[in-house]
Amino acid sequence: MSLLTEVETYVLSIVPSGPLKAEIAQRLEDVFAGKNTDLEALMEWLKTRPILSPLTKGILGFVFTLTVPSERGLQRRRFVQNALSGNGDPNNMDRAVKLYRKLKREITFHGAKEVALSYSTGALASCMGLIYNRMGTVTTEVAFGLVCATCEQIADSQHRSHRQMVTTTNPLIRHENRMVLASTTAKAMEQMAGSSEQAAEAMEVASKARQMVQAMRTIGTHPSSSAGLKDDLLENLQAYQKRMGVQMQRFK
């Protein structure tokens, strides 16, 4: 796996799923391929994106700044500086300085990532802030190691939280989660169906599923009534894809 592929993988792992994630993935691909060279426009676009947390925006801004060539005097962006300030906690800043000194001695991506993983997310963000604000310099490879270590920590905590929700025994949370998943699956089906004639059937199934979820929420149904809803939808989607000559078995 190339370095940039690895960076893209880690960064995208902390972006919530949805159309915006696909858009960010495309921007990252363009930046890494050298196709997007207007850093200012890129940062303005990033700043106005909804849904993303300030820290995720800060990390993306840091990655764009590391990758896109820019004039020496280009202003640093406030939204990135604020996100990478470690919440203004002096402990984070102290640890960030210690980490920075260690990173100065590293020359490889994996070496830097290994060193960084033993620090807290706040210290890692502060260390990125030091580099972003030009208070310290490390090689691009080492900076990418720092980015990936931060993303790994964030993704770990997101995964723990997600696992807690999926394994919860609370029937109301499970019921709502199944309805949300069914609804987003239906939305994805509608987007994939496009405008072909065969698509009418898939659109019909998706639309009925969304109406059903709305009705279930309106009248308040038994928590077990949503069981299998998403799987039924996915079976319909796969049947539709088969007819269209597309074989994709990996949706479940």
Curated annotation (Swiss-Prot):
- Gene3D superfamilies registered for this protein in UniProt: 1.10.10.180, 1.20.91.10
Reading the lineage from the top rank, the first entry is: Viruses
Membrane topology per record: Peripheral membrane protein
Instruction: Please provide, in alphabetical order, the Gene Ontology terms of the cellular component aspect for this entry.
Output: host cell nucleus; membrane; virion membrane
The protein's matches in InterPro entries, at most eight in alphabetical order, are given as: Flu_matrix_M1, Flu_matrix_M1_C, Flu_matrix_M1_N, Flu_matrix_M1_N_sub1, Flu_matrix_M1_N_sub2, INFV_M1
What is this protein's function per UniProt?
Plays critical roles in virus replication, from virus entry and uncoating to assembly and budding of the virus particle. M1 binding to ribonucleocapsids (RNPs) in nucleus seems to inhibit viral transcription. Interaction of viral NEP with M1-RNP is thought to promote nuclear export of the complex, which is targeted to the virion assembly site at the apical plasma membrane in polarized epithelial cells. Interactions with NA and HA may bring M1, a non-raft-associated protein, into lipid rafts. Forms a continuous shell on the inner side of the lipid bilayer in virion, where it binds the RNP.
Misc. comment: Most abundant protein in virion. When expressed alone can form virus-like particles in transfected cells.
Q: What is this protein called?
A: Matrix protein 1
Question: Native species of this protein?
Answer: Influenza A virus (strain A/Equine/Tennessee/5/1986 H3N8)
